[in-house]
Design a protein with these regions (language model features):
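Charge-rich, low-complexity terminal tails
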Residues: 41-42, 58, 184-191
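Short acidic low-complexity segments
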Residues: 79-92
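Core catalytic region of metal-dependent phosphoesterases/phosphodiesterases
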Residues: 1-82
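Conserved beta-sheet core of the metallophosphoesterase superfamily
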Residues: 91-190
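Short, flexible, glycine/charge-rich loop motifs used to bind or transfer phosphoryl groups or to couple energy/partner
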Residues: 44-45, 86, 109-113
Length: 191
C-alpha cells in the first residue's frame, strides 16, 4: 500500500483517541520514508523531484480537544493542516473536513449534494461512508468530482458498538492528469 506515488495524500482528521493519534504518528514515518526514497531515486536519475501534497483537514473530534499537538506533528512532517470547516483549494481541488449546504448550518451528506451545492472538485470527510459523484460544469466545460471519504481511524470509539464494522478505515490518494483516486485501507499498514 506504500508503493504508489500519488499527487495528493489526504486525511480528514477526527482522531478520536490518543492511541489513534499514536498509530498515525507511527505510520507517518512510513509515508515519509517512501517519499524520501523516491526523491533520492529522482535525484540519481536526474528527474523531476517527487513532491506530493499532503493535506490534513482537522475534524470536529480534533477541535473538541486540544488539537495543537496534532497540528504540530503533521506540520513537522510537511503536511498542510486545514482548520475545521475551513476549505482550502490546491491545484483546483477543494479540501475540507465537511462542507455546509449554502446558506445553512446543515452539512452536505452525499457527494451528489456537494456537487450541486459547490460546483467544483471537492474532497470531504466527516462521514464514515464512502461516496463519489461526477458531473459536468457547463460554465467551465469540464468534469467535476466530489468524493466523501471516511476518516482515518484505527480505533473506533466504544459508543459505536458494532456499528463501526461497516466503516472503511484508511486514507485517500489522488493523482491528477488524468484524475484518479485510490482508497488505501489502513489494514495494509498493519501487515
Amino acid at each position: 500500500c506504500l508503493d504508489s506515488l500519488a499527487h495528493f495524500t489526504n486525511l480528514r482528521g477526527d482522531f478520536t483517541t490518543d492511541e489513534e493519534l499514536a498509530c498515525v504518528v507511527k505510520h507517518l514515518r512510513a509515508f515519509e520514508d517512501k517519499i524520501l526514497r523516491e526523491q533520492d531515486k529522482n535525484r540519481y536519475d536526474k528527474k523531476k523531484i517527487y513532491r506530493p501534497i499532503k493535506v490534513l483537514c482537522l475534524g470536529n473530534h480534533d477541535i473538541r480537544k486540544d488539537c495543537t499537538e496534532i497540528e504540530r506533528i503533521f506540520k513537522e512532517h510537511g503536511w498542510v493542516v486545514v482548520p475545521y470547516l475551513e476549505p482550502i483549494t490546491i491545484e483546483g481541488l477543494t479540501f475540507c473536513h465537511c462542507m455546509p449546504k449554502k446558506n445553512s448550518d446543515l452539512m452536505c451528506t452525499t457527494a451528489e449534494e456537494l456537487l450541486q451545492t459547490w460546483h467544483t472538485d471537492i474532497i470531504v470527510g466527516h462521514s464514515h461512508v464512502q461516496d463519489y459523484a461526477e458531473s459536468f460544469n457547463i460554465g467551465t466545460g469540464k468534469s467535476i468530482r466530489a468524493i466523501k471519504c471516511p476518516c482515518f481511524t484505527g480505533f473506533p470509539p466504544q459508543y459505536t458498538g458494532f456499528g463501526h464494522m461497516a466503516w472503511p478505515l484508511g486514507w485517500l490518494e489522488i493523482t491528477l492528469n488524468p484524475f484518479e483516486f485510490t482508497w488505501r485501507n489502513i489494514e495494509c499498514l498493519w501487515k
